[in-house]
């Protein structure tokens, strides 16, 4: 694989700020469906690995929810910029792991970057609304808050597009 930035192809799990193997040390092969060549291996995570990741995410969320909208926007903008800086490598990795034509992979990643751009701007607008009530002398006030840690399943067909839309929401 001819990547400009080899550090983008890490064959480990990212849990609590660290790249790790599965506790079982078991792996599975990543196969390019277009030619059946082995692209790499990934840790075969168990329930224990998943629970560890969820616990770490909950701790991180406690910090994330305390950030201002502007501070969140800065993080999301940085992610957006990293996507754009690495679009060629990300597209190559996507093409090799799921067999999409390279132009389709670049298109999907570009489209996904539009979501990170949009969410970076929306993060600044975390204010709520005041809504008129049907009862005299009353107001309805809404607020926007982080929901918390969510489990997501991404389809093989649109892995990069699903990530920013579900991760940020």
Protein language model annotation of sequence segments:
Residues 1-41, 74, 78, 128-154:
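Terminal low-complexity tails and localization/encapsulation signals of metabolic enzymes
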Residues 159-165:
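Conserved small/polar residues in nucleotide/adenosyl-binding loops
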Residues 37-126, 137:
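Glycine-rich loop-to-alpha-helix module at the N-terminal edge of alpha/beta enzyme cores
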């Amino acid at each position: 694989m001819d990547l400009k930035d080899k550090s983008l192809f890490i064959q480990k799990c990212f849990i609590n700020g660290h790249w790790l193997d599965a506790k079982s040390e078991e792996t599975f092969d990543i196969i390019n469906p277009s030619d059946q060549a082995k692209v790499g291996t990934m840790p075969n995570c168990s329930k224990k690995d998943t629970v560890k990741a969820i616990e770490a995410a909950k701790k991180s969320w406690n910090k994330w929810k305390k950030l201002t909208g502007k501070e969140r926007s800065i993080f999301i903008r940085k992610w957006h910029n990293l996507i754009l800086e690495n679009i060629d490598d990300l597209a190559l990795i996507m093409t090799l792991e799921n067999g999409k034509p390279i132009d389709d992979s670049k298109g999907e990643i570009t489209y996904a970057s539009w979501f990170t751009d949009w969410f970076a701007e929306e993060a600044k607008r975390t204010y709520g609304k005041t809504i008129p009530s049907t009862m005299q002398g009353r107001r309805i006030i809404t607020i926007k808050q982080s929901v918390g840690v969510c489990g997501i399943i991404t389809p093989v067909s649109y892995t990069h597009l699903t990530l920013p839309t579900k991760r940020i929401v």
